[in-house]
Design a protein with these regions (language model features):
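Short, conserved structural micro-motifs that define repeat-unit consensus positions
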Residues: 42-54, 76-87, 95
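Short, intrinsically disordered terminal tails adjacent to the first/last structured region
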Residues: 122-137
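"…centered on the first transmembrane helix and the immediately adjacent amphipathic helix/loop
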Residues: 1-58
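Interfacial helix-loop-helix junctions of multi-pass membrane proteins
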Residues: 32-39, 81-104
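Membrane-interface junctions at the ends of membrane-embedded or membrane-associated helices
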Residues: 3-4, 60-67, 116-124
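Small-polar-interrupted transmembrane alpha-helices in polytopic inner-membrane proteins
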Residues: 15-26, 69-87
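Membrane-interfacial alpha-helical segments at the cytosolic side of multi-pass membrane proteins
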Residues: 49-63, 105-118
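Membrane-helix interface segments
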Residues: 7-13, 32, 64-71, 96-97
Length: 137
């Protein structure tokens, strides 16, 4: 087995563990917390969880997939859809397309952060050389 593939398999344990945690949490019935706090907490949890899941998948797939961020978003989106379907079987929970949209916000933030990171490094490289990254020399 290729060392890069082996490393990617080991790195994939982190996002798989997070997927297990998301599955466990989504299997919990609705709590008796004040509805507004529960809604805010769940939505923030959706954004944060899927932001982290997308980042972990991109990290796990780096060096193996041609476009690790795109593949990470696709995996995360598919999991968000399947998790919402899973919630339709949990008492007191509902699976909604709105929640998939909220999950997608986390995925979009992760993709933006991953896209922005190389740009920031490139800008610093040009600053160190005393040039502007927008001007061609």
């Amino acid at each position: 087995m290729n060392p890069a593939t082996r490393a990617a398999l080991l790195r994939s344990l982190a996002p798989l563990a997070l997927m297990g945690l998301i599955f466990y949490l989504s299997a919990q019935p609705s709590s008796g917390v004040h509805p507004w706090w529960e809604i805010i907490g769940r939505k923030l949890g959706h954004v944060t969880g899927y932001l982290l899941l997308t980042l972990l998948w991109a990290w796990a797939l780096n060096g193996v997939a041609r476009r690790p961020v795109l593949v990470a978003v696709a995996i995360s989106f598919a999991y968000a859809c399947s998790d919402e379907y899973h919630q339709t079987f949990v008492r007191g929970r509902t699976g909604t397309p709105v929640d998939v949209g909220v999950d997608a916000i986390g995925m979009a933030i992760a993709a933006w952060l991953m896209h922005r990171r190389p740009q920031a490094a490139k800008t610093e490289q040009f600053k160190d050389a005393g040039r502007s990254p927008t001007r061609a020399y």
